[in-house]
Amino acid sequence: RTTDYIYCSVVFEEGQKSYYYLTEDDSIKIGDFVLVPAGKDNHEAVVQVVDIEYFFAEDVPLPAEKTKHIIRKCTDEDFDLPKPE
């Protein structure tokens, strides 16, 4: 990877406005669910990645220092899914 920043566009609900979050995890793919800090109180929220863009520092769409970071990729435990028997 030769770019400085990975910006992921995420949606909180399907069809809603997308928001940029930064990540250093280049294993995240479009369609993945990730955990992010959301709102003024930075509560944790599960969102879906709808686009991934790579930028050099001079080309970032939002200042990196003002952009929140993805916490991590989601696991089954984040969805409280029943375990298969």
Where do the language-model regions lie?
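Terminal, basic amphipathic appendages of nucleotide-handling enzymes
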Residues: 1-19, 25-26, 30-85
